[in-house]
A protein has these predicted regions:
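Hinge/lid segment of periplasmic solute-binding proteins
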Residues: 82, 106-155, 161-164, 184-185, ...
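Short helix-initiation/N-cap motifs at beta->coil->alpha
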Residues: 80-89, 179-185, 262-275
Length: 433
């Protein structure tokens, strides 16, 4: 891949880079490629699957050491941040103009920063070599602001040991092309599980909070081939005919005891039920959750049932972004570090594998030996529109789970609930613009 920066040239070369203070006016500054520079790098606990370093901070230290060995004029100062309070720390740093030079994150926050003119665009990245969906998710106004390194779909999972014991594995779509199945086939499976053992929840549809809410949203969207937004991600459209049919089916299945009693439960409860064998399937699953919640039994990834014949997936995208801190030398050094962690012959692939994600590069496939990971890796062409970056996304999320609670509790009909949700959710877009 063509390198992000073109500063790796003769020592006497001087380049120009557009930069300025965070959120301020851009101006041209000269860059000395050999000047000693210090940059800061913040990272969440992302890299926990390296064979040598199991802790993110240890892996990041090794990554930095390897980078500094190749770039002795650049020193990288590192800070690990947690998923709990990390986002607040970043916002505080932005307000106090002490934002890190490099952050490894996801588009939800990154694109919000790009919209506020806080980031350096990655104009030299060859986007044609990257997964199109990942590029779209990482861009703002057609400019790339996060270098997508890893992608992974959110899908469903089944405890095959449990279904073997119950004698219902034959009702799963494991031998069908793409493992695709219809709503009718899925319902037949759920009813069979319930009939074999009433103490086991066939699937747990949870809706207490926004934690893991991509699972229920993708579940409802898929059933009859709707989606949360239009393909341009300009408005919410889940109240179309197929979206209403999907939520009507969920209400019916919920009342019949096929989807558990999840009004007062959230994602962690559903995953714990799956992990402990109290639920046969989970509607929130990914390579990452498989490692943490299905290590004790034989699991299989499952597509969402979709009567169109092929499921669509919400998905994770992860990668580094660069804050514009008003220093051209720091920005240039940060680009070198970003390029190293993604494209270095050794550390690019190692960083990706340490995250447990699949590559956003079109030509980097087959990284894992597991049959299940190979299956999940092949789903990238079924990613749906990535709407996590839509303006007002955070305010939409409580509207969703409150609406679904009302439907399941019988306080509103699926159509009435979805119509009001879409009207209110579209207001959050306008309010955020």
């Amino acid at each position: 891949m063509r390198k992000i920066n073109k500063l790796l040239v003769a020592a006497t070369t001087t380049a120009l880079i557009l930069t300025g203070c965070v959120g301020g006016k851009k101006e041209e500054q000269k860059v000395d490629p050999n000047k000693k520079v210090e940059i800061t790098y913040w990272d969440f606990p992302q890299f926990t699957k390296d064979k040598e370093f199991s802790k993110t901070e240890d892996f990041d230290a090794a990554l930095i050491k390897a980078f500094e060995a190749k770039h002795p004029n650049i020193k990288v100062n590192y800070q690990k941040i947690e998923f709990t309070d990390g986002p607040a720390k970043i916002e505080t740093a932005i307000q106090s103009k002490t934002a890190p030079d490099v952050i490894y994150d996801a588009p939800g926050r990154v694109i919000a920063w790009a919209a506020k003119d806080l980031l350096v665009p990655l104009d030299d990245v060859d986007k044609s070599k990257l997964n199109e969906a990942a590029v779209k998710a990482s861009s703002y106004k057609d400019k790339l602001y996060m270098y997508p390194q890893g992608v992974a779909p959110f899908l469903m999972g089944v405890n095959k040991d449990l279904t073997d014991k119950l004698g219902v594995t034959n009702l799963l779509p494991l031998d069908k092309p793409g493992r695709n199945w219809t709503v009718e086939e899925y319902e037949k499976f759920l009813k069979a599980v319930k009939a074999k053992d009433p103490n086991i929840t066939p699937a747990l549809f949870y809706t207490k909070s926004q934690a893991g809410d991509q699972g229920p949203r993708a579940f409802v969207s898929n059933l009859f081939n709707s989606w949360m937004t239009d393909k341009d991600i300009s408005k919410y459209t889940i109240n179309d005919e197929n979206g209403v049919k999907g939520l009507e089916w969920v209400k019916k299945a919920y009342d019949e005891g096929l989807l558990g009693q999840g009004v007062a439960l959230e994602a962690k409860d559903a995953l714990e039920a799956f992990k402990s064998g109290r639920a046969a399937t989970t509607i929130l699953f990914s390579p990452g959750t498989a490692a943490s919640h299905a290590s004790g039994f034989n699991y299989k990834f499952l597509p969402f049932p979709n009567n169109s014949g092929k499921a669509k997936y919400e998905y994770l995208v992860a990668g580094p972004a660069i804050f514009d801190n008003g220093d051209a030398d720091k920005a240039a050094a940060a680009k070198k570090f970003v390029d190293f962690m993604i494209n270095d012959k050794e550390w690019g692939k190692r960083t990706l594998l340490a995250s447990g994600n699949f590559s956003a590069k079109k030509d980097e496939k087959g990284l894992y030996d597991s049959e299940e990971l190979k299956f999940a890796e092949g789903l990238t062409d079924q990613f749906g529109p990535y709407y996590n970056t839509i303006p007002g996304f955070a305010k939409m999320r409580p509207l969703w789970f409150n609406m679904v609670q009302g439907v399941l509790n019988g306080k509103t009909t699926p159509k009435e609930g979805l119509d009001k949700f879409v009207a209110d959710a579209n207001k959050t877009i306008k309010e955020a613009l």
